[in-house]
Amino acid sequence: ASDFFGKHNIQNCLAAILLTYAAGAPLDVIRQVLKAFKGVEHRLEKVRTIHGVTYYNDSKGTNVDASMKALEAFPQGHLILIAGGYDKKTPLDDFMALAAKRVDTLILIGDAAERFEAAAKKAGIQDIRRTGYSMEGAIMLARKIAKAPQAVLLSPACSSFDMYDNFEQRGRVFKGIVNAI
């Protein structure tokens, strides 16, 4: 599956291979399923590439640990990260330290923006922007500043409840805006 990446996803995939093989599934069937598998919606989901900039929906990144896994899937960096939402008040030091290594621009949305900005500055992130409660504003800002080979990643590290009913709705809104560009 060419759009399937990230160390945590590979670990899950290997576990599934071992379990299905141990249960008696033939290797050719396992291989066919793996080739067809495109990942799971809202989990490091590749949405679209526009002028060499690829947009990823990781709306399921509803906590710091999940969003750190998403950042770790981009060891080369070159990211514009859209983060924020309903603030769970979790510690941000490790998340922002990793973001400082991988993220060129941090775009913050929602209730958590102020606290996330303070933590990002403390971690040494230079380019921090805020777009209030506007996903469209965040995406349009990312589109304006992104240059190939950068990627735009929505991985909020927050719940969605300040702006959306759930992470699925947030992810669908993100994809809808990106696909309308």
Model features per residue range: what roles?
Residues 2-104:
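Nucleotide phosphate-binding/pyrophosphate-handling subdomain across enzymes
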Residues 21, 69-72, 97, 118, ...:
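Short, well-ordered alpha-helices that flank and scaffold nucleotide-derived cofactor binding pockets
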Residues 93-150:
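C-terminal helical cap/extension that packs against the catalytic core
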Residues 115, 160-162:
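Short glycine-rich, flexible loops that bind phosphorylated cofactors or substrates
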Residues 140, 144, 162, 173-181:
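Phosphate-binding loop of NTP-binding sites
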Residues 153-157:
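Short beta-strands and strand-loop turn motifs
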Residues 164-167:
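Short, solvent-exposed loop/turn segments at secondary-structure boundaries
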